[in-house]
Swiss-Prot record:
Molecular-function GO term, any one: GTPase activity
Protein name stated in the entry: Signal recognition particle receptor FtsY
Family indicated by similarity: Belongs to the GTP-binding SRP family. FtsY subfamily.
Cellular compartment(s): Cell membrane; Cytoplasm
One GO BP: protein targeting
One Pfam family linked to the record: SRP54_N
Record InterPro entries: AAA+_ATPase (IPR003593), P-loop_NTPase (IPR027417), Signal_recog_particl_SRP54_hlx (IPR013822), SR_rcpt_FtsY (IPR004390), SRP/SRP_N (IPR036225), SRP54_GTPase_dom (IPR000897), SRP54_N_sf (IPR042101)
Length: 409
């Protein structure tokens, strides 16, 4: 996930660090750090049998027993001999130094010989390289420009003294620049559901996007997540245009354990969703998740239809579902849907297969709306809440995420 983007960001931080070291005429120094000692001072002079010595004695005992009874070496004896050999090899490898025994470690680090003030010209070439790399990673141009500006704001004019940790300063500067891009105002879907429930009405969420992004599957994933949290859910088969769309949603609903409200293929999408809302009101169901036909923004008739859906059903949220693998195309699509129906948030799918990370970095900033969830696999549980801090940690290799290869659909 985001491998190329991660590599370039870390490389940028490293190059800026080296620029600062060069300007500050940094020199390498050895330092000794005291860590929590694993042994007490008195134990240094106390003769106690070591674990490997005890193991060695036991192994030698096995060999002696075999010789006394004058039998052929058993498997156990052969294992004992092998164990003695391994212990000797380990002892050769583990040469404990004076520093090790006192819990001290020695490291080489660079220290500035003089104070440095970072100028724009000092880091300009590094940022130009980053700009090209980000564009190649499908990051939107306006986002690239903003990110470069953010890094400059973090670093240019900053004074760095010999006592400062240069690596920490540069990595934090890039992190903060990224976080600024990712931090859009959050939407708490659960809070909306709870508020509406207290008022005795369902929460209505309409999903929009083009074909092939995983919109219908995402609806099923969110239904599963909400059901796991104790909310009742009904699905509205508002995609009456695509062949097999209703059947696909029905199968997902069966797997997840929720009901679907549907009409015949070709029916009015707004009417289907309206009926689902009335059904939810009559039965006290908490949430209506409404599918709609995938459509290109250039298809005027279908875009007019989605405007009608939003106008008639008055949803609490309109969520755009985009494919992370399409990079800048996902950003363009989100912008078009936002112009048409004023979307409230974004769900990005197929993020587990996204090596570039351009869409994830760009889409929220480009339209000024938050990413709500990320689709990260092919199980109903593979929908995770988006968090800017988590994304930054992921981009800088500070947190790994285990993806499942299992498939449920």
């Amino acid at each position: 996930m985001f491998g190329k983007l991660k590599e370039k960001l870390l490389e940028t931080a490293s190059k800026i660090t080296e620029k600062i070291y060069s300007k500050g005429e940094a020199e390498e120094v050895k330092e000794e750090k005291e860590e929590k000692s694993k042994i007490s001072f008195t134990s240094l002079f106390k003769k106690e049998p070591k674990k490997e010595e005890v193991k060695k004695e036991k192994a030698e005992e096995e060999i002696k027993k075999s010789e006394i009874v004058k039998t052929e070496p058993s498997e156990k004896v052969e294992e004992a001999k092998e164990e003695i050999k391994e212990i000797k090899e380990e002892k050769e490898e583990k040469k404990i130094t004076f520093f090790d025994r006192f819990g001290l470690t020695r490291a080489i680090k660079k220290v500035l010989k003089k104070e440095v003030v970072i100028l724009e010209e000092d880091i300009e070439d590094v940022l130009e390289e980053l700009e090209i790399a980000l564009l190649e990673a499908d990051v939107a141009l306006e986002v690239v420009e903003k990110l470069i500006e953010n890094i400059k704001n973090e670093l240019v004019g900053r004074k760095i003294s010999p006592d400062d940790n240069v690596e920490e300063i540069t990595i934090n500067a890039v992190k903060n620049a990224i976080k600024n891009i990712l931090s859009q105002e959050k939407i708490d879907i659960e809070e909306i559901i709870k508020k509406n429930k207290a008022e005795g009405k369902p929460t209505v969420i309409v999903f929009v996007g083009i074909n092939g992004t995983g919109k219908t599957t995402t609806i099923a994933k969110l239904a599963y997540k909400l059901k796991q949290k104790g909310y009742s859910v009904v699905l509205a088969a508002g995609d009456t245009f695509r062949a097999g769309a209703i059947e696909q949603l029905e199968q997902h609903a069966k797997n997840v354990g929720v009901k679907v409200i549907k009409h015949k293929p070709g029916a009015d999408s707004a009417a289907v969703i309206y009926d689902a809302i009335q059904h939810a009101k009559a039965r006290g169901i908490d949430v209506v998740l409404a599918d709609t036909a995938g459509r290109q923004a250039t298809n005027v008739n279908l875009m007019e239809e989605i405007k009608k859906v939003v106008r008639v059903t008055k949803p609490d949220l309109v969520i755009f579902v985009g494919d992370a693998l399409t990079g800048n195309d996902a950003v363009y699509q989100a912008e078009e849907f936002n112009r048409a129906v004023n979307i409230d948030g974004i769900i990005l799918t197929k993020v587990d297969a996204d090596a570039k990370g351009g869409a994830a970095l760009s889409i929220g900033y480009a339209i000024g709306k938050p990413i709500l969830y990320l689709g990260v696999g092919q199980r109903y549980q593979d929908l995770i809440e988006f968090d800017a801090d988590w994304m930054v940690r992921k981009l800088f290799g500070e947190e790994e995420f285990e993806f499942s290869t299992e498939r449920e659909f």
